[in-house]
Design a protein with these regions (language model features):
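Glycine-rich phosphate-binding loops of nucleotide-dependent enzymes
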Residues: 1-268
């Protein structure tokens, strides 16, 4: 059984069809990427998976359970978490406080525990802070816990978002352009971290990514959307050679793993 499965998902906004009968499956322990020119429907697909949008047609299941109709917080509790294209940290909170926010769906405390601050609450608070420090270390931010999020360099803010997402203990992590704004060196370092998380923490990852070099190097499978339709899917090397993908991105020009995101943007 696939970890995540979408069948014939369609989403419309007035007269615009953002997704047109799209099928998608993702197996546990894999890294998959969804690519396509701007406006192809990639983020809309993520928003369907996470309960922000409800499609007009189709089904989505996670571990065999229906996802559609659930609130975003309920979907997070199922084990699906995401990051966004634009950084959404709390800038006036410290790094570790941002991570602690991500644990809210996993805190086994009653209302009385919280307002009375009893022994159960104090023990849970200690465990949360210890786990938050551990996640910062995993993300390469071991000594940054007490720094305000707004004072961190851009690449470290991206890593902090990842640590906060991990705080919800997800089985599936959806990352919307995780390397946006990063140098190639920062992007390679982040991808190495993601690979390690998949291997060590048994995570499953689904990426939206414009950096084709990253997509080709890290993905087990690639799905290509164009104008809301799936035009290709398969191993990275096979997708790279698909004439429909080359046409969608670069017209008749040759597409290489180093092709820039700007080339895709010209098609949008």
């Amino acid at each position: 059984m696939p970890l995540l499965e979408a069948r014939a998902v369609s989403k419309r906004f007035g007269g615009l069809t953002a997704l047109n009968a799209v099928d998608f499956t993702l197996d546990e322990g894999h890294i998959a990427s969804i690519i396509g020119p701007n406006g192809a429907g990639k983020t809309t697909f993520f928003n369907v998976f996470t309960g922000i949008y409800v499609p007009e047609e189709g089904t989505v299941t996670f571990r065999g359970s229906p996802v559609l109709g659930r609130r975003p917080d309920e979907i997070t509790s199922l084990g699906i978490c995401r990051t966004f294209q634009n950084i959404r940290l709390f800038p006036r909170m410290t790094a570790i406080e941002n991570v602690l926010v991500g644990m809210h769906s996993r805190i086994p405390l009653s209302f009385w525990d919280v307002i009375s601050r009893n022994d159960r609450w104090r023990g849970q608070e200690r465990r949360q802070w210890d786990h938050g420090a551990e996640l910062l270390e995993v993300a390469g931010l071991r000594d940054k816990g007490n720094e305000l999020a707004r004072n961190l360099p851009y690449g470290e803010q991206r890593r902090l978002e990842l640590a906060r997402a991990l705080a919800s203990d997800p089985a599936l992590l959806l990352l919307d352009e995780p390397t946006a704004g990063m140098t190639q060196g920062e992007a390679r370092s982040l991808m190495a971290l993601l690979r390690r998380l998949v291997e060590e923490r048994k995570l499953t990852l689904l990426l939206i990514e414009h950096n084709m070099r990253v997509v080709m190097e890290v993905s087990d499978r690639v799905t290509v959307l164009d104008y809301g339709e799936k035009i290709a899917e398969g191993r990275p090397a096979d997708v790279q050679r698909d004439p429909r993908v080359i046409e969608a991105y670069l017209g008749r020009r040759r597409w290489t793993p180093g092709a820039s995101a700007a080339a895709g943007e010209r098609h949008a």
